[in-house]
Amino acid sequence: MTDITPYIILSKPQLGENIGSTARAMKNFGIEKLRLISPRDGWPNDSAYAISAGADNVLNNIEVFSTLEQGTQDISLLIATTARKRVVGTKPLNIFEAVEKAFEHTMNGGKIGFLFGPEQSGLSNDDVVQADFTISIPLNLSLIHISEPTRREG
């Protein structure tokens, strides 16, 4: 069976607690592939483990990279998340279009990644232009939508 589980990529996360919270949410939806790009407080981080509520399997397998280019070089479909309207060249999709594209892509053997920016500022335009698409996820539905590709059967 094809592995359709996405990678969650946190670019320049600022607090270990937010990494732990992300891992906890990922575990709740069966997503275990977490990558960090240049975490401000370094990795590993005790604060992440303290708040992760048992998501050690996610935290223990985190991959850390210095640059976004390094952390996404094997990702064949990168979807950047943003709350702002962007005028840079990346095509915006609604969440349902993004899920469908991600599912189709993984069924054809591709690796997908959802890219999230720093807590305080979000993704820079330089980060966004490296993505294939952008999406804006309604806050109260974000975890449901990100887990959607893992619910599909091939």
Report the location of each language-model feature.
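Hydrophobic, well-structured mid-protein blocks that either form specific transmembrane helices
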Residues: 111-143
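Short internal beta-strands
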Residues: 33-39
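Single conserved hydrophobic/aromatic residue that forms the stacking wall/gate
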Residues: 144-154
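S-adenosyl-L-methionine/SAH cofactor-binding core of RNA-modifying enzymes
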Residues: 46-123
